[in-house]
Amino acid sequence: MKFKKLLAIALATTLVASAFVGCGSKENSDDSTSTSANKSTETEIYFLNFKPEIADVYKKIAEDYEAETGVKVKVETAASGTYEQTLKSEIAKKDAPTIFQINGPVGYESWKDYCLDLKDTELYDHLLDKSLAVTSGDGVYGIPYAVEGYGIIYNDEIMQKYFALENKATDVESMDDINNFDKLKEVVEDMEANKDELGIEGVFASTSMASGNAWRWETHLANIPLYYEFKDSAGGDGDALQAGLDANEIEFKYNENFKNIYDLYTDNSVSEKGVLGNKSVDDAMAEFALGDCAMVQNGNWAWSQINGIDGNTVKEENIKFMPIYTGMDGEENQGLCIGTENYLAINSQVSEEKQQASIDFINWLFTSDTGKAYVTGDLGFIAPFDTFNDDEKPADPLSKEVINWMEKEDVETVKWTFQAFPSQNFKDTFAGALLEYVQGTQDWDYVVQTVKDSWKSEKAE
């Protein structure tokens, strides 16, 4: 898989002093850090952040960057699930974001009038796999800043407690035995039956369905059945993402697989189905951190949330990942869902001075010692640039788990094909149908038809 190769290169690459050239454009030959430091200016740049869970980290980064360079970085963060809406509002203002994020080719089509060509920047030069960038013609308009992974996060201490139960109804002795949906379901349902003895309120954290908080299902979980559908369409070693981008309609042929795991989540949860419409991602991560449940679906970015919960009882060494099994044929060899969805873009409509200052900032973040320490430490990114050597890997347990899964032999990583989803409205419609289903006001056939109709109508616009 490409991402395995990417990580292997990223982690094996050794920094050489001469590898660090200028900040910003190729024509700038000064050292990246000193360039910014020597360009003290009152220019203010504006970064519109996508990820609420790391908003405080970006604030600290901005403070350090201003102290080092004199350049003020305004950081604003969109509320969960509202990035497109917030960007539309902010981009129209006089002091618009100078740095923003697009979610792949579909996002570029929405914002191409505001995306500066970045092909001549040093950061693009440092990108290990140029094919990961968002391009159009000869231009480069979005640079990925992190390779991320998601799956089912589990508390290994609770799992080991279950395996040691004398009265457990399964013959499963270790996590290695759980390699498909049937085994997962068997274990989860038995754990739920023994939840008092295990000291948990439910096996899974709450399936957050509050407005703006359903992205784990409408996007990340939906990625799995649609990845396999697009893979079928592409045939053999074809490009599943491109097949998704080309699809004007979807069959949703593996909808029952989605239903398998979604039902497992909601039937064996800390929360009753009737209250899920009020549950947030923060609620779910707090439940996991406090030991109220054994499992939660999320990605390596969730470490900052888990670690930041007051009263956190989960030890770092017990935080592990397993794949999201749904009942697909051959899923015994399935790995985590690994990819990138967030790309940095520079606003082409702001002044050249602000464009260059913005380029300088993102280059500093991924090439300077201070910036890289934030990237691998506080942000926990697995950065796809050759500026990170083997000693600069993320140290948090979830990023380590992603790296471990990427290095496994004979494991199929599930590619992030949700970049092909036609719009945020499609995702919101999907989430709305799921909420009606889980609340019992609609059946599963309604969900399937709604998803198919929404894809078709959104692609037609």
Regions found by a protein language model. Give the residues of each.
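Extracytoplasmic/periplasmic substrate-recognition and gating elements
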Residues: 72-73, 93, 310-380
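Short helix-initiation/N-cap motifs at beta->coil->alpha
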Residues: 77-86, 179-183, 275-290
